[in-house]
Amino acid sequence: MASRHRRGAFPAGAKAAPEAEAAKESVAVAVRFRPLSPREVRRGEKIAWYADGETVARSEQSNLAYAYDRVFGPTTTTRHIYDAVAQYVVNGAMKGINGTIFAYGVTSSGKTHTMHGDQISPGVIPLAVKDIFNIIQETPNREFLLRVSYLEIYNEVVNDLLNPAGQNLRIREDLQGTIVEGIKEEAVLSPVHALSLIAAGEELRHVGSTNFNLLSSRSHTIFTLTIESSPRGQSNEAEAVTLSQLNLIDLAGSESSRVETAGVHQKEGSYINKSLLTLGKVISKLTDEKATHIPFRDSKLTRLLKSSLSGQGRVSLICTVTPASSNSEETHNTLKFAHRAKHIEIQATQNKIMDARSLIKKYQNEIRQLKEELEQLRRSIRTGTPIEDTMQKKHHLLETKEDCNVKLQSRLEQGEEAKAALLERIEHLTELILVSAKASRTTKSSHCPRRRHSFGEEELAYLPYERQDIILDNESNMLFVPIEGFGEKFKSSPKEETENQKGHLNWLNLRKCDSGSTNLTSSDGENPSSTKSLPALSTPLGIGFFNVTSEQRMSDYMLAENVPANLLCVGHREFPSDSLPVQETPLVSRKTSDHVDILREQFNILSGEVALHQSVLKRLSEEAGKNAMNEQIEMEMKVVNDEVKLNKQKIASLERRISNSMSNSRGMHDNLELSLPYIEIPEQLNEKAFQLEASECQEFLLSERTTFQHNTGIVQETGSQAHKGKPLPSDVSDEFLKKASQAEIDELKQRVSELTEAKSQLDSCNHKLLEESTYAKGLASVTSVELKALSVKVTKLMKQNERLSSELASGRNQRRGSHGPRGARRESHTKRYEPARRGDMNALEAMLKEKDQRQAELHTKIEESKQKEAFLEKELANMWTVLANLKKTRGIDQEDFDSKYNGSWA
């Protein structure tokens, strides 16, 4: 639906929440460093700027440093950046607080990768869309309406990316904010629907190739989500509706003079630099307390960002920079821009409007009151009052009665029309309202932390493939390693590393079903001790592999929760627009299909768990056969056996429930047969994953076995003596303790040797540094001596120059004295007549110039006369032709005409 879209503004009746004045905040600023590209590495580029900790960006070449809210290195993933600086803006938007997230930086610094991402590493926009629908699912006591719009600013022209016909849209302002007239707003029903609209808009966006990037954005884009939320049910009719906007902005990169462009690209670059320069001026004025005028209207971008930059909502700025030394100046300018933006103060408040259904109640009450007033008036007129009326008073009462009747009737008609229109709008919007598919929970459960949901295959289909021209070659990326960020190897945070070291079974922590279905818990949740002895993955490869496996296995299950209640059984990707009616399926079939899908996903997850437990059990049994006295391994085997039995029972119950559900629904049989091949594919992938995990476990256990080889003989001897019934001698236990203490002493000695080696290395480094410092001091002393010698030479040369100049002056004076009075007479003669000669020369030159000017004027006059002569000849020829035509038409003889003509002249 095309409408006049307000940015940072709301319909009439909108007002801030009646709460205490919100505390002042500042713009959240984050800086993201991308790694060096292969081309920069081949050129031998050096690191000019780097991330010093989590909050400081420091220069390698000087002592400059800037502090921000967060600073991310090249190995940081986009999901981590979203959790740190963008998620709180999205949460505020879901509560009615406006939010803006935008990326700023030079060309090829990674802005589009940060905002949009790819299938391996989704960007901020897909993560925000996914998070919004997750919040909707976890808020069963409210209902939501989501509308999206997508526009671009190309060469200072606003274009609609969701409507190809919407070009050169007009921007105007009124008391309620900035309005983009004619932009299309689309109501979205699921993450797949929103991502498909983004992908369609990206097809219309202007891109081009530059010296730094094969596909460079040539326009600014603004993706806006308008979020309406109201209480669910009839219990809270008086509560207002919250309305907010979330702007996700991908700015085009500023270009330096080193970018060789021409023609259209040069024009695009000039417009991009102009808008970004205006943005920098606006931010500088906003941070200047003495500024009286802020130039918001100097560019389309700043006009649209006026409400966000003026402090009417939360703002998060992500500045992407490159650490290469060739772009050191551009990186410094970006960091200065981010430092200025950090000082902008904002005061975010919640926006509330009156609910449409509350307006209906208001109109109904008003109509009822008007009808009561009208009935009372009619009743009073019928019964009458004992008044000594005159005719004039009766006439006046009749007139007032008629006026009141007309007014009341018109108000009744207006109220009925407004009521009908609002009822029609509510009926239309109810089809687009998103509600949670879960049952209402208590307040305590609603405040539980939200679990991270992964992207499904349908959602990933609308994200671009991994960009090959940004940072790394594809040869360095493994096929099954989910490398986020800019293609660097995945590096977990210290907290994540400690969590990964708890064991392989940690990734089996599954989401508990909120309904009455079977609850799924991980093994470490039931028996915390069962995971302590399991080996942790020692390489990033294993970590990345299991992250991919768990996300792929959970994706389809989580996707079913993010689809609205009226679209749970839709199997295709086409979504109804505002103008098309939505086909409603019966409630029973929708619940049955939803239930069967969830049971099927639980079946797949449990089968994967059983396969993993069996592989771990097999490995533990082999280890137990080799180490007969290891009680810890036996306990783990017992725990895993219990887990396998419990999961098999759950699988059997799920199979029974699936068969019962399938028997109750006829139409679901074909869908189940179609989905069986898709069930086999995750099982095959899980088997491959389990094989890889088994090999990792084997390597770990082999390393553990080698560490305990020196105790194997003693354990076997004590075991044989225990079987024979002999008492254990005390010297054996003492020997065992001695060997254990000896092993600890050896380990400590090894550590001491390592520390001594490190100390020796540090001493050698210090020695080298001392040598270099002494060498530098020697050079400084030598240079000082040379400078002194040079200064002495310079003074000598200056004195010699003065002596030579004095000799030259004396020689000239002697020569003048030798010429005598004759030479002086000649010089006086030349000086006397030289001004006269110069005056004559100047007069001659002036006369020559005047002559040339006159000749040029004469030439121009001659040319003009020739042109006039030619023009007159043409006119004369035309006159003769006209006369000939006249003679022919009138039939006059030529001789008579000549005689008359000559006679008249005679």
UniProtKB/Swiss-Prot annotation:
Which Gene Ontology molecular-function terms are recorded? ATP binding; ATP hydrolysis activity; microtubule binding; microtubule motor activity
| Compositional bias (Basic and acidic residues) | 824-840
Task: Give the matching Pfam families.
Answer: Kinesin
GO cellular-component terms in the record?
cytoplasm; kinesin complex; microtubule
Question: Origin, by domain of life?
Answer: Eukaryota
The keyword ATP-binding is annotated on this UniProt entry:
yes
Keywords tagged on the record: ATP-binding, Coiled coil, Microtubule, Motor protein, Nucleotide-binding
Return one Gene Ontology term, BP aspect: microtubule-based movement
Q: Where is the Kinesin motor domain?
A: 26-344
Q: Where does the chain bind ATP?
A: 105-112
Region Disordered, annotated ranges: 803-840
Q: Return the protein name.
A: Kinesin-like protein KIN-7G
Print the organism lineage. Eukaryota, Viridiplantae, Streptophyta, Embryophyta, Tracheophyta
- Which gene is the coding source of this polypeptide chain? KIN7G
